[in-house]
Amino acid sequence: MKKLIMLSFALALSWGSANATDHYRNPVIPGFYPDPSICRVDSGYYLVNSTFDYFPGVPLWHSRDLVNWEQIGHCLTRKSQVNLSGALSWGGIYAPTIRYNEGTFYMITTNTTGGGNFLVYTDNPRGEWSDPVWLEQGGIDPSLYFEDGHCYMVSNPDDGIWLCEIEPKTGKTLKPSRRIWNGTGGRYPEGPHLYKKDGYYYLLISEGGTGYDHMLTMARSRSIDGPYTANPANPIMTHSGQLKQTSSIQGTGHADLVDAPDGSWWLVCLAFRPQIGEHHLTGRETYLAPVSWETNAWPVVNGNGGIDLEMTADLPVKVDKQRDFTTNIRFSSKQPLGYEWVYLRNPLMENYQLTSNALRLTGTSATLNSKDLPTFIGRRQQHIDFEATTQLNLSEAGVGDMAGLSVFMDLYAHYDIALRREADGKNTLVVEYWLNSIHHVAKEIPLKGSKPYLRVTGSRDHYRFFYSENGKSFTEVGVADTRYLSSETAGGFTGIILALFCQSAADASKPQADFYSFNYHPVN
């Protein structure tokens, strides 16, 4: 990504050991990384996720073993590609699909906030992607299928799965859209993907909505135009039934299939981890499952159509260690920010600056509760039990200006611990909770020093807030129920972002906050 402070960053990663070469942990990409799509190029795999109202859009991952994933960039890094003006947590960029054909990578998706379906392409996935190629066929969750010089697009306008042929570099429709399948009768048939195997065209879709009734169904045909015959064993994957009703994983669906060089088949899907009752906060995450797909037969996912947190499978590549997403950062202009950092909507980049020893945020009157462009940069909560700590200095500020750390689901639901400038020029530590029209100030403490540490910890049922003047001895200053920030309570399609922010109390004020560090790790 050009000129953004989102290029490579030397993360300090913690690695946990898998039990053996045939064991791995789900989710393979934890946190708010939903709607995975995957393709293979030679021995490497590429994967993308949806991003909704966050920027840059569509994270791009690479793996050699299907278990350990390295983020190598984003597909949408410019406002000319993705305009997120006014987007909320149920808008913006929906499910993408990634495909590779004759030396070119294609990513197709939907901007539900404006423009509809489009694709971008590149010869170098680690570099810049093209400007959008806009497409005529509507619906959401578009996908591409290439065969013998033809490019087909599938999506779900009018509550069904529709197919058309397109010219991918121009977006021109070459053959008109036609309905090819309605699904099995479940709500919201969506997320279609086409594959060809043993002379059949297989059509994989999701039904039931992206919640507890989510499921994968499949149909096949000898002709790409149909008619498609449903798998008599549908659904091929779901946790909605009695078998998985007490599972730690729910909402399995929206999947994509890929074959490995050894001939084995694999599936990536989204699912979520309820952590207190039926409430989840880490968003819909990316999971991996083995697939048995015999000649002329239907695919079988993990033997019984379900997945587990601890998986046993014959992985195509030996895996000795599995990444555990732990980060320790000392902000510096010598090390540009890593790809895990995201902004709300299209950021005003002049408000973000890496100095010799800090990430400097310049606030505006756009607050965390605004549909505008607040000064906000964060990374996903990826573990149910975690600890996140930052040190900051609200160096320049007017009365009422604030900077701090937010546990952010969306503009209607977030918990914040922050510094607020008072009339005497000193700072007050403030812990406050925002839940729709409810605003509760839980704590206000006058501070002595100017560079405190702020900390938030998460568990299944509570977020706890702490501060320290010296970085060694921390005092608890707030506790809040996790359920009120959950997707089930707050709504939307995202997950918790742990965000650094700075905002002003008056239009004329331009406060500056220097954040010196950010540390995040799971707590076992």
What are these regions (language model features)?
Residues 20-524:
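Carbohydrate-active catalytic/glycan-binding domains of CAZyme proteins
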Residues 4-13:
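Sec-dependent N-terminal signal peptides
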Residues 13-19:
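C-terminal segment of classical bacterial N-terminal signal peptides
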